Structures are given as structure tokens and as C-alpha cells.
Amino acid sequence: MKVIIVGAHGEAKELINRISSGWSISVIDLDQDKLRNFSTNRQIEKIQGDATSSLVLKKAGLESTTAVITLTLNDEVNLEVLKIAKQNDIFRLSSVVNEASNTDSYKNLGAEVVEPDILLARRFEHILEPRRVVSQAF
């Protein structure tokens, strides 16, 4: 199985360190310095370039990819990458959502989304009110 992760951030490092060794991993980022300093406990392919370019995605192995995860801080970039992936018959799409108003755009592509604001609020809710069973976040 192969995954392309767009955005060489802390979340990407944490994910790479957590997923099983059965995954072949490519990380794409525009920033060469970020990639140079991006280290994990796994062998990964690092690609410097614009992930909204089909050529860059193909260099990362898009044709043989099982999943694409976008973690950039720019929803426009994330959505464009996911559109290209979907056009190439990749259906395991996931992304961080930076602006809640863009959530429907991700879902319309069939992407699984993570909304950091909701995750943080839910975690702090459990810290403040640990005995509550039902969360107001649902």
C-alpha cells in the first residue's frame, strides 16, 4: 500500500510514526528546508514541489497510490490535490480542514476530514468535564 502525504508538518511526522510498516510513504512539500529537516523513524520518499501539479504527484507515484492525505494550511491547495487524486481513481482521500466553511467542499470529493478546532474543543471538554458521557460536539 502506498500513501502520499502533502505537507511536511508535525502531523505528518506523527502519522508516519503511527501507521504500519506495510505502507510506502511519499511526502510532498514546497519548502525544501522543511523537507531537509523532516525526519521520522521510517524510510520515506521526500519530494520538493507543488503538489497541485499532476507532474509532481506522478513523480510521487500517484498511479500506484492507495491513499492521499493533505495536511497543508491552505484549503485551496488541499482541495486541488484531492481533486487530482480523485480524477486518477484514488478514493481513499483524507484532509485537515483549515476553515470550517470549506468542509462541504471536502465531503463533496468524498474525503474523510479532520477538523482541528472540533478535535481540540472535544479534548478540552473531556478534560473539563470528564464524567460527561454525551458530548455537545456531536
Report the location of each language-model feature.
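Cytosolic regulatory regions of ion transport systems
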Residues: 1-138
